[in-house]
């Protein structure tokens, strides 16, 4: 085995430099993986604006790859073998101790004894534990494998937030997570899905994912559409999928939710914001936060996401508008930022 690999690292200015780095560190129970595909997430974009020094380890968490080496031990429970193609859950399960209070019921994201971070998917190799590796069926290729992660985020949010069949569902934003939320909501039986979209390519994709009503992002457009679709009541379940360095989407989602409905806070607003907590109190709105994935109702969200993608009923891979090689990853980040390029999801071929 070689001692070095190619990896892309933010130099601290938001520019990615591809260079030789040491192979990822092994740890107790770690599996060596050859990365094949990695998606550029909105959080990857936002982090380029927040860093003031270069990365020590590669990032990238929307990842699919191939098992190169398994550590000694019994892996029958996982059904894994060298050469298997897997979607890699690297945030929780891939580092989880599997023994603590949270791991005992499959909430690996909240593990109290996570293994050290050894680097993400913007590199040729990764190390993660077997609990975070999910085999891909033959019908899914590497492109599909690297969109399992964002689909699992929405699966987790809708399950954890307790969306019900026949709900009127609103989705604020039609970027990657908004689009997976639209698709998952329809798959889980939503009666009507209303979505907002900022860019033409997002609006088109929202319709392909199953949105019944797609509106722009002008003041009141989304809220009005949710009211009209629900006979003036408001949506039963609203997903805030935007987050980032703004808070308008959070306020929109609350306003569009009916009394005693649920607002799923999925996007992650990264700035301080003012919010009147009296409104959800008086209206008895449940604001439910959700992040990442875990085991719910006996199945991991990655497993459900893989089944949805393998069903052939959801054209989610069509959100992948651009692909670049690892050596040209900066071109991928540039395209992801520039929505005039038609970009939705940019993936890196590793």
Q: At which residue positions do the language-model features occur?
A:
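Glycine-rich beta-strand-centered segment in the early N-terminal region that forms part
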Residues: 24-38, 50-99, 137-139
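C-terminal capping/lid region of NAD(P)-dependent oxidoreductase domains
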Residues: 2-3, 216, 232, 268-269, ...
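Glycine-rich cofactor phosphate-binding loops and adjacent beta1-alpha1 units
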Residues: 161, 204, 208-286
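Mid-domain Rossmann-like dinucleotide-binding core that forms the NAD(H)/NADP(H) cofactor-binding site
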Residues: 140-219, 224
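C-terminal substrate-binding/catalytic core of Rossmann-like NAD(P)-dependent dehydrogenases/reductases
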Residues: 271-322, 330-331
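NAD(P)H dinucleotide-binding glycine-rich loop of Rossmann-like/cofactor-binding domains
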Residues: 92-172, 314
């Amino acid at each position: 085995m070689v001692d070095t690999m190619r990896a892309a690292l933010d130099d601290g200015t938001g520019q990615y430099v591809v260079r030789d780095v040491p192979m990822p560190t092994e740890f107790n129970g770690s599996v060596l993986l050859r990365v094949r595909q990695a998606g550029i997430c909105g959080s990857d974009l936002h982090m380029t604006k927040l860093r003031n020094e270069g990365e020590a380890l590669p990032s990238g968490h929307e990842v699919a790859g191939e098992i190169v080496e398994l550590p000694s031990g019994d892996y029958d429970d996982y059904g894994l073998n060298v050469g298997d193609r897997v979607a890699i859950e690297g945030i929780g399960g891939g580092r989880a101790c599997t023994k603590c209070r949270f791991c005992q019921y499959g909430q690996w994201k909240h593990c109290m004894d996570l293994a050290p971070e050894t680097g993400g998917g913007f590199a040729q190799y990764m190390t993660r534990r077997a609990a975070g590796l999910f085999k891909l069926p033959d019908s899914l290729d590497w492109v599909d494998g690297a969109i399992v992660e964002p689909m699992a985020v929405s699966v987790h949010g809708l399950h954890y937030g307790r969306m019900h069949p026949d709900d009127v569902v609103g989705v604020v934003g039609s970027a990657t997570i908004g689009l997976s939320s639209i698709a998952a909501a329809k798959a889980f039986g939503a009666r009507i899905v209303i979505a907002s979209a900022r860019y033409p390519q997002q609006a088109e994709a929202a319709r392909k994912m199953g949105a019944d009503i797609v509106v722009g992002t002008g003041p009141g457009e989304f809220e009005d559409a949710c009211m009209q679709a629900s006979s003036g009541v408001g949506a039963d379940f609203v997903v805030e999928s935007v987050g980032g360095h703004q808070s308008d989407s959070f306020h929109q989602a609350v306003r569009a939710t009916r009394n005693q409905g649920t607002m799923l806070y999925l996007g992650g607003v990264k700035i301080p914001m003012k919010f009147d907590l009296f409104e959800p109190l008086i209206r008895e709105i449940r604001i439910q936060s959700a992040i990442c994935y875990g085991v719910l109702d006996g199945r991991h969200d990655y497993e459900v996401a893989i089944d949805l993608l393998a069903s052939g009923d959801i054209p989610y891979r069509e959100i992948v508008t651009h692909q670049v090689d690892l050596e040209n990853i900066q071109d991928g980040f540039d395209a992801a930022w520039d929505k005039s390029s038609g970009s939705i999801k940019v993936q890196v071929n590793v």
